[in-house]
Amino acid sequence: MYPYCLKYLTNGLRSKQMINFLCIQNILSARTLKICRFRFLPTPSHPTHKMAQETRAISSISEAANKRARKLSKRRAKKPVEEGSSGHVLLLEIENLIEKPVLANVPFERFQEIEVKISYLSSSGDGIGLVCNDQYAVVVPFTLPGDIVKAKLHFLADTYALADFLEVISPSEDRDDTLIKCPYFAKCGGCQYQMLSYDKQLLQKKRVVEKAFQYYSKLDSSLLPAIKDTVGSPLQYNYRTKITPHFDVPKGGTKGPLIIGFQEKGRRRVMDIEECPIATKTINEEYPKIIEDVQSRANTFKRGATILMRDSATEDGKHCVITDHKMIVREQFGDLSFTFPAGAFFQNNNSILEKFTSYVREQLLNPFGRKEHQRPKYFVDAYCGSGLFSVACSKGFLSVIGVEISADSVRYAEENAKRNNVSNATFIVGQAEKIFSSIETPPNETAMVIDPPRKGCDQSFLNQLLEYSPYRIVYISCNVHTQARDVGFLLSQEKGRSYKIDEIRGFDLFPQSHHVESILTLTKVVS
C-alpha cells in the first residue's frame, strides 16, 4: 500500500455518518486516483469525541494540501516567469505531457516522501515522473528515465510538484554512478548529468535542440532541417575557465566562518564547497587560498557577495587565477590570443573554442549547394564583444565589421584584431535603436553572426535585422529556446519568408550540465 494512503477508520463514529476522503492506492504501479467512500459504525469501547477529532483531521488533509498549493502557486504567479527560462520551458514540457488535466485536488502533501518512476528527461536536466493515471507530474532533479527513486516534495502546484532527490531505489539502465566525480553532485545545482555517459549526454542535448524548435519556433516541420549531432567537448571535466562562488551574510553580520560556494539545488541557500571538478585545475589549485583570504575578512562583510575566479594564461604559457573584475584576462586557443576584462563576457570552455569558431566560419562561407558566386564577401559581427568571431572568422572575407554598443568592448576588439594580425576588420560603436545604420556593405553579399544573451534578441533588433536583410545569418545562442522563438518570428514576417534554415547543430560547451550552445544558419533564397 502506498505510504500516503489514509488509514481506515474503524472507531466510534455516529451511525449513518459518511466520510469522503482521498485514498491514493499504489500510485507507482496502478497510477489510479480513487475517491473512497466509507461507512463507519460506532464502537462503544472508544470515545466518540476522539474519533471526531481524527475525522476532522483526515478530512482536512486534502483541503489543506490544496490550500497550500494554491497559495504557493499564486505567490509564484506574482513573479512572472521569463519566457525561455528553464522554469518556463519546464512548465511547457509538463503541459505537453499532461494534455488534459482532470484532477480536482492536489494528491500529495508538502514535504511528503514518495516513490516515483521517472519517465522523461526535461530540457532543464530534471527527471519527470507521471502519477495519478498520468495526470500529475513530479519533477525530480538528478534522475534519468527508468530510475525509480525516493523523493521529497517541496512545492505543490495544480498539475505538478517539485521534489528533492533522496535516493535511487532501482536505477535506470543509463545510470552509472561510478562516473560521478563531484562529492557535491545531487545537491549542488551546477551539474545534472554526471551519472550519464558522455555520448548519452550529447544525445540528450540533441533532443533538447529538437524539442526547442518543435515547440518554441511555431514553424511547420517542413521548414526545419534534421538537427545535426551535438559536437562534444575535448574536455568533460576541468574545462571551465570561470566560476563565481558566492556567500550570504545574515542581518547583523556574521561571527563564524562564511558558507562559500554554489546554490543548493531547489533552495535559495548557498552550500559550502571546497572544489569544483568542472573548473580548470588552476582554479581548483588556487581555490583554497582565495577562500581563506575571504574568510580572514569575514567580519568586515555587511552583505553577501560573489567571488570571481577566472583562469588566465600568462605570456610564458603558465596560468593564474584573476579575481578582480577590472584586471585583464588573456585567453588563448589554437593560434589565436585574446585579452578582455575579467568581468566581461567570454566563452568559458577554452578546449572547444577552436572547433566552435571554425564551424561558425564554415557556416558563414558555406555555399550549401548554391552557386559559388553567391558566397558572401563581407562579414558583420553583431554583439561582437571583444571580437571573438570577428577575429577567428575573418579569413575569406574582403572586410569584417564588428558592431557593439559598448565602447570598451570595441576597444578590446580592436586590440585583439591587431594582436592576431587581422587587417580586414573594423569595429564600430552602434546605437541599440539603429544598430546597422553605419553598415554600408551590400546586404546580398553580407553574412552576419548574431550572438545575443540568454534572453535572445529583442523585437527592435529583429526588425532592424529584417530591414537590413543580409544574405546569410548565423545565429549563435546559449539558450536554444529563445533562439527557436526568434527564428520562428523572423521566418513568419514578410521580409523573412525568403530565408531558409540550412543547418542547426548543438555544441557542448558545458559538459555534465543541461546547457547546450546552438548554432543555426539562415540563408536568403536568391533566384
From Swiss-Prot:
Highest taxon above the source species: Eukaryota
Keyword Oxidoreductase set for record: no
Assigned keywords, A-Z: 4Fe-4S, Iron, Iron-sulfur, Metal-binding, Methyltransferase, S-adenosyl-L-methionine, Transferase, tRNA processing
EC assignment: 2.1.1.35
Catalytic activity entry: uridine(54) in tRNA + S-adenosyl-L-methionine = 5-methyluridine(54) in tRNA + S-adenosyl-L-homocysteine + H(+)
A single BP term in Gene Ontology: tRNA methylation
Active site feature: 478, 517
Group of enzyme by EC: transferase
PROSITE patterns: SAM_MT_RNA_M5U (PS51687), SAM_MT_RNA_M5U_2 (PS51622), TRAM (PS50926), TRMA_1 (PS01230), TRMA_2 (PS01231)
Residues given in the record as [4Fe-4S] cluster binding sites: 182, 188, 191, 276
Gene3D superfamilies (alphabetical): Nucleic acid-binding proteins (2.40.50.140), Vaccinia Virus protein VP39 (3.40.50.150)
CDD domains cross-referenced by the UniProt entry: AdoMet_MTases (cd02440)
Residue span, TRAM domain: 107-167
Binding site for S-adenosyl-L-methionine: 347, 383, 404, 451
InterPro entries according to UniProt: MeTrfase_TrmA_AS, MeTrfase_TrmA_CS, NA-bd_OB-fold, SAM-dependent_MTases_sf, TRAM_dom, tRNA_(uracil-5-)_MeTrfase, U5_MeTrfase_fam
The keyword RNA-binding is annotated on this UniProt entry: no
Molecular function in Gene Ontology: 4 iron, 4 sulfur cluster binding; metal ion binding; tRNA (uracil(54)-C5)-methyltransferase activity, S-adenosyl methionine-dependent
GO cellular component, one term: nucleus
Function statement: Catalyzes the formation of 5-methyl-uridine at position 54 (m5U54) in all tRNA. May also have a role in tRNA stabilization or maturation.
Family of the protein in this entry: Belongs to the class I-like SAM-binding methyltransferase superfamily. RNA M5U methyltransferase family.
UniProt protein name: tRNA (uracil(54)-C(5))-methyltransferase
